Regions:
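Bacterial N-terminal signal peptides
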Residues: 10-18
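Bacterial N-terminal signal peptides that target proteins for export
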Residues: 2-10
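C-terminal catalytic-base region of ester-bond hydrolases, centering on the histidine
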Residues: 153-245
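Short, solvent-exposed loop/turn segments at secondary-structure junctions
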Residues: 33-35, 91, 116-118, 167-170
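Active-site catalytic motif of lipid deacylating hydrolases and related acyltransferases
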Residues: 23-82, 118-121, 128
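Short hydrophobic segments within beta-strands
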Residues: 28-31, 85, 113, 163
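Serine-dependent carboxylesterase/thioesterase catalytic core
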Residues: 65-157
Length: 245
């Protein structure tokens, strides 16, 4: 699996961006469904600035996508370089933003934990409300909503590294609705970037994935549920050393 800290150095060289006072490296954090930001805990890397992106995922993907694009316009152009850390439905917001915009953002990679990019079979069910609390957008994040909503292969050539969990999440019974292995909210078909909703036993399974989507660090985290996974990618990438699952 990829060692992303070394990968960051290689990307900076590839972009030929001087990491001086005239340029910045920004680590953009994007939360999940029904959230308005990532939350209180962000990753921190020496010499880089962490951003708690103000993305409102309560009402519509259109609103969230517009706010995501505005965030990238602010931090990821000119001499700046960004790394984008997304959780849950934040993965779908980022994917949709790339697909619907032709802007030349300087993004080294997207790091996705428990991504709902491919939608959840729980979308529009009472289970979403039990797990995350109710919001209007929760009724529109199903597999057909997300998979048919935009071109997931249009990534501007940007890599999305993905990790997934397979742990139990209260109220537990919803896992019967999700195909294959799942973290209690999304299946590994979604969290692994696969092009179909067929059940998967890990995100390393050999099957078609959306362009530039990769499994990073582990084929799955068998004991971690959807909530546990939120900080796992940031921890794996060196942004947190305490409070890691």
């Amino acid at each position: 699996m990829i060692t992303t800290r070394l990968h960051k150095l290689a990307i900076a060289i590839l972009f030929t961006i001087p990491l001086t006072a005239h340029a910045g490296v920004f680590d953009i954090h994007v939360g999940g469904i029904c959230s308005t930001n990532f939350g209180d805990t962000l990753g921190h890397w020496a010499g880089e600035t962490s951003i708690n992106a103000p993305i409102d995922q309560r009402d519509s993907m259109a609103t969230a996508t517009a706010q995501m694009a505005a965030t990238l316009d602010t931090y990821c152009t000119g001499g700046n370089l960004c790394y984008v850390y997304v959780y849950s439905n934040g993965g779908a917001v980022m994917s949709r933003t790339l697909a619907l915009n032709a802007r030349a953002w300087n993004i080294g990679y997207v790091a996705a934990a428990a991504s709902n990019e491919g939608g959840s079979e729980l979308g529009g069910t009472g289970f979403i409300g039990e797990v995350f609390g109710g919001c209007a957008l929760a009724g529109h994040i199903g597999t057909s909503d997300h998979r048919n909503g935009w071109n997931h292969n249009d990534t501007h050539g940007i890599i999305t590294g993905m990790i997934a969990g397979n742990g139990w999440l209260a109220p537990f019974v919803q896992s019967a609705v999700l195909p294959g292995h799942d973290d209690g909210a999304v299946s590994e078909a979604s969290a692994g970037g696969y092009t179909t909703t067929s059940g998967r036993s890990s995100i390393c399974e050999a099957a078609p994935k959306y362009a530039n989507h990769q499994a990073w660090f582990s084929c799955e985290y068998g004991s971690l549920n959807h909530l546990d996974m939120k900080l796992k990618m940031i921890c794996n990438d060196g942004g947190l050393t305490t409070g890691c699952p």
